[in-house]
Amino acid sequence: MKIYLVGGAVRDRLLQRPAGDRDWVVVGATPAQMEAQGYSAVGRDFPVFLHPKTGEEYALARTERKSGRGYRGFVVDADPAVTLEEDLQRRDFTINAIACDEDTGTLVDPYGGVRDIEQRVLRHVGPAFVEDPLRVLRAARFMAHFAPLDFTVAPETMDLMRNVAASGELDALVPERVWQELRKALVSAQPSAFLRTLHDAHALGPILPELEALYGVPQRAEFHPEVDTGIHQEMVSDMAAKLAPGDDLVGFAALTHDLGKGLTPPEEWPRHIMHEQRGIKPLKELCARLRVPTEHQQLAEAVCREHLNVHRIDELRDATVLELLGRCDALRRPERVARIALCCEADKRGRLGFEDSDYPQGETLKRLHQAALSVQARDLDTTHLKGPAIGEALAKARVKAIAAAR
């Protein structure tokens, strides 16, 4: 029996980045031997065990053979005769196919992962890459994760990704996995790299057609010097990651705020009148398909519908501001307002040449929201009021408070 550290922990060590969970591979062992040494079996699809003291995962070396469609269609062989090199060969990218003997510090790198780390290249291990469509998504997510290090996708790997997209295999991805990869990308350093990689691989359309529809759609250059709505979508996602690092609620709402522009009739380009209303339908469809959590969907719908109103909040009547807050459910969910403000700021600054601009509208929205929130029904004299009249009096008092806070 021989144990090696593998995967992301080795990769991140070589990149001099903080490592996450450590994964181990065990060569030359059987499940019975692992359990005899106190390891607990937890793997459902293949033999994985938890260390009796550290709780870290130890997987028996295995090979995988394609047996059906999608990323679940594999036959696993975890025979003790499976070698370390065979186990590493089934992995997705060379940078993840490096093992380390922790006793000696010796690296086992049969597929050139160390070289690719040095050259900042994301490269597939072998032709079996095309057997698992999830790897296309993982490639895009890795590009977003490692964007600050200037990684590129190897041309031959991009060719294989396009082959997977053309094969129809991406249709076999289960919604939860697509959402999981998207969610990770949204909190990465540069979510745009996720979008751009999938777009270049012709995979964004099959996976996220609502986002692919924005590429090539022009906007008015005086407001959007970047012109292409797809590029604007990338810039907004990156700005959201900068303004709200680690917040996938903000990331998702910012990403999807302009979906309506993908439905603008070409004869109306580059104007997109009413795109904020048109965007709700494709947003609902995307959320239903990916089974997006309700909290994410509600925030995204609020930002999609109201971002133009927030941009011009100084021009809105006081009563209209209260109506806006009501549509966003901000009086019952006050924590939502700060996120809406961040999303709208990301939209405004996610434009070529506007990256460093101020966005006072965000502070105005929060200030007026606090003013409205400071007035509660219990603060009013409702002695002679009944039913709807109480609500009307509360609304009038809140409008007055908003006016005073201007």
UniProtKB/Swiss-Prot annotation:
The protein's Enzyme Commission number: 2.7.7.72, 3.1.3.-, 3.1.4.-
Residues reported to bind CTP: G8, R11, R91, R138, R141
Residue stretches spanning the membrane: none
Positions that bind Mg(2+): D21, D23
Cofactor requirements of the protein: Mg(2+); Ni(2+)
Cofactor note: Magnesium is required for nucleotidyltransferase activity. Nickel for phosphatase activity.
Binding site for ATP: G8, R11, R91, R138, R141
Any one GO molecular-function label of the UniProt entry: cyclic-nucleotide phosphodiesterase activity
Signal peptide: none
One example of a Gene Ontology biological process annotation: RNA repair
Catalytic activity: a tRNA precursor + 2 CTP + ATP = a tRNA with a 3' CCA end + 3 diphosphate; a tRNA with a 3' CCA end + 2 CTP + ATP = a tRNA with a 3' CCACCA end + 3 diphosphate
Keywords of this entry: ATP-binding, Hydrolase, Magnesium, Metal-binding, Multifunctional enzyme, Nickel, Nucleotide-binding, Nucleotidyltransferase, RNA repair, RNA-binding, Transferase, tRNA processing
Pfam families xrefs: HD (PF01966), PolyA_pol (PF01743), PolyA_pol_RNAbd (PF12627)
Listed CDD domains: HDc (cd00077), NT_ClassII-CCAase (cd05398)
Quaternary assembly: Monomer. Can also form homodimers and oligomers.
Additional remark text: A single active site specifically recognizes both ATP and CTP and is responsible for their addition.
Protein family per UniProt: Belongs to the tRNA nucleotidyltransferase/poly(A) polymerase family. Bacterial CCA-adding enzyme type 1 subfamily.
HAMAP family listed in its UniProt record: CCA_bact_type1
Name of the featured protein: Multifunctional CCA protein
Organism: Stenotrophomonas maltophilia (strain R551-3)
